[in-house]
From Swiss-Prot:
Mg(2+) binds at D9, E58. GO terms for molecular function: holo-[acyl-carrier-protein] synthase activity; magnesium ion binding. The gene is acpS. GO terms for cellular component: cytoplasm. It comes from the Bacteria. This is Holo-[acyl-carrier-protein] synthase. It is found in: Cytoplasm. Its cofactor is Mg(2+). The keyword Lipid metabolism applies. InterPro entries: 4-PPantetheinyl_Trfase_dom (IPR008278), 4-PPantetheinyl_Trfase_dom_sf (IPR037143), ACPS (IPR002582), Ppantetheine-prot_Trfase_dom (IPR004568).
Length: 127
């Protein structure tokens, strides 16, 4: 296997918290898939959850080489978790098409946060 994409993004959690305070769930509905939005609504720290998902999806879009736009939407990237809590990444629609163009078959993701920031790194591998 070879690495065909690498992306990293960092988000200031307070910036997301302020956006949610101003605009309610507007950003969450734009960024999160339906399954992610359900978790967001039940989460004990929804702004922190949203910041981590935002960073993860931006990192994934960078790894795909497109950023958000150019056929890749936030909705085309789903961040989940294994039963043990490790993050997972899945691609659909435009993101899946872009991954195929790179001959990519699997994405690896790491997400971390501390008091003020959320950061994510995505590595895409080919066959």
């Amino acid at each position: 296997m070879a690495i065909v994409g690498l992306g990293t993004d960092i988000v200031e959690i307070e910036r997301i918290t302020a956006h949610v305070a101003r605009s309610g769930d507007k950003l969450a509905k734009r960024v999160l898939t339906d399954a992610e939005f359900d978790i967001y609504q039940q989460h004990s720290q929804p702004s922190r959850y949203l910041a981590k998902r935002f960073a993860a999806k931006e990192a994934a879009a960078k790894a795909l080489g497109t950023g958000i736009g150019r056929g890749v939407s936030f909705q085309h990237i789903h961040i989940g978790n294994t039963p043990d809590g490790a993050p997972t990444i899945d691609f659909t629609e435009g993101a899946q098409q872009r991954l195929a163009l790179l001959n990519g078959v699997v994405g690896h993701i790491s997400i971390a946060d501390e008091k003020s920031y959320a950061i994510a790194t995505v590595i895409l591998e080919s066959r």
